[in-house]
């Protein structure tokens, strides 16, 4: 439960409302928020929320194309005679143990290229970080049973036109996050991080080769995406963000923008006093601080290291 986490939640619920979602499932991630914060927000946005771990409703019924659909979050909330769809944050291995549901959609973070069929249940998964939209079409027989299905991923790239109402919500979110950063207590100043210009006094050829890497333009990618004031993004696109003498903002500490020498080789003031003292080597562990599975799924240490070698 963090200030930025709350802003994200508010933006998501507002967006779901504008997009007229039929149902939204609350799971483990939402447990971090107190109910006196979360549920007034749900009421305000008129969000059709389902939650298995509270007094809130655990299922709801809607009708689409003359088919009665029961959407639930509790495996026990199945309705006989309806088409039953379960929303779950359980891993696929646990979803396979749930019987009696026609479709189970998981949000466990696992990537399923195609839905699985398990004991007459179709198990599908949302795409990590919502980069693709899953479209699942069911073929329903005259007996109301699922006879087959078709599935495809729709990439949500620039070719998909943005909804102006949702874009307004996201712009408002970015503005509020930027305000959080401005109002946050700035870490103590100090002669700690030197910046690439100081390193270049002795390592000028290395600076020149660094300029040709994507690390050198890391902060510009945030500016283009409108995320240059987002703390969750800044930490991997600057030097020493959140630390004494590290990057604070592009206005106050422009010399520490981008992924520079000290972000990878570490902070070692002793090296300036004794040049024979080497900086730390750039191991895979160092890279994995930012090149996580979530943000850099194709990361391959030897391949990526070659791209920044100098």
Place the predicted regions along the sequence by residue:
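Acidic, metal/ion-coordinating pockets
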Residues: 1-158, 165
């Amino acid at each position: 439960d963090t200030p930025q986490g709350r802003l994200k939640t508010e933006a998501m619920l507002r967006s779901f409302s504008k997009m007229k979602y039929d149902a939204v499932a609350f799971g483990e991630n939402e447990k971090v928020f107190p109910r006196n914060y979360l549920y007034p927000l749900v009421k305000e946005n008129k969000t059709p929320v389902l939650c298995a771990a509270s007094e809130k409703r655990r299922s709801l019924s809607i009708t689409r194309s003359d088919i009665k659909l029961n959407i639930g979050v509790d495996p026990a909330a199945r309705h006989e005679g309806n088409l039953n769809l379960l929303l779950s944050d359980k891993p696929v291995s646990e979803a396979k143990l749930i019987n009696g549901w026609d479709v189970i959609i998981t949000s466990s973070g696992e990537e399923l290229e195609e839905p699985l069929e398990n004991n007459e249940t179709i198990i599908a998964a949302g795409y990590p970080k919502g980069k693709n939209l899953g479209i699942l079409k069911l073929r329903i027989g005259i007996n109301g049973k699922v006879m087959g299905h078709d599935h495809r991923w729709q990439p949500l790239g620039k070719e998909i036109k943005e909804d102006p109402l949702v874009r307004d919500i996201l712009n408002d979110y970015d503005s509020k996050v930027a305000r959080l950063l401005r109002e946050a207590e700035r870490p103590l100043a100090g002669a700690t991080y030197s910046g690439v210009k100081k390193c270049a006094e002795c390592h000028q050829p290395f600076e020149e080769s660094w300029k040709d890497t994507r690390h050198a333009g890391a902060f510009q990618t945030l500016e283009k995406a409108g995320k240059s004031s987002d703390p969750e993004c800044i930490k991997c696109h600057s030097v020493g963000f959140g630390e004494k003498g590290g990057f604070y903002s592009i206005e106050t500490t422009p010399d520490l923008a981008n992924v520079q020498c000290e972000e990878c080789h570490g902070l070692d003031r002793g090296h300036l006093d004794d040049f024979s003292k080497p900086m730390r080597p750039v191991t895979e562990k160092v890279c994995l601080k930012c090149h996580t599975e979530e943000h850099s799924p194709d990361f391959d240490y030897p391949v990526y290291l070659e791209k920044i070698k100098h």
